[in-house]
Amino acid sequence: MVMTDPIADLLTRIRNANVVRHEVVEVPSSTIKKAVLNIMLQEGYIKNLEEYADGSVNMIRLSMKYGKNKERVITGLKRISKPGLRVYCRKEEIPKVLNGLGVAIISTSKGIVTDREARKLGVGGEVLCYIW
């Protein structure tokens, strides 16, 4: 089965695990998924990442992060730029998620970065997703 949107698949797996409060999520590995997950790790939305080989397929195991009494750290995830409708922004148009409380992940010429880093670098790019 061919996956047309691996980032949407990643976000959906995380969203579903978050709803039922799973501790661990496993996703097939790719360079762009690793970059998105590293940003989520730096921003404090997930606990840790572990890459491993499952036969011929490389996988990523990520540990979900919850607060006291299993409160969700991730309130929402939204895919913005999709294969059928790409969404780009110039450096002046970089979105703020919930007035800066959330994070926009943007694919730029300098790599995959958060909205704050893109503003600091002075670059625009493709808006991959919002996390809050």
UniProtKB/Swiss-Prot annotation:
Belongs to the universal ribosomal protein uS8 family. GO terms for cellular component: ribonucleoprotein complex; ribosome. Part of the 30S ribosomal subunit. Contacts proteins S5 and S12. It comes from the Bacteria. GO terms for molecular function: rRNA binding; structural constituent of ribosome. This is Small ribosomal subunit protein uS8. One of the primary rRNA binding proteins, it binds directly to 16S rRNA central domain where it helps coordinate assembly of the platform of the 30S subunit. It comes from Clostridium kluyveri (strain ATCC 8527 / DSM 555 / NBRC 12016 / NCIMB 10680 / K1). GO terms for biological process: translation. Keywords: Ribonucleoprotein, Ribosomal protein, RNA-binding, rRNA-binding. SUPFAM superfamilies: Ribosomal protein S8 (SSF56047). PROSITE patterns: RIBOSOMAL_S8 (PS00053).
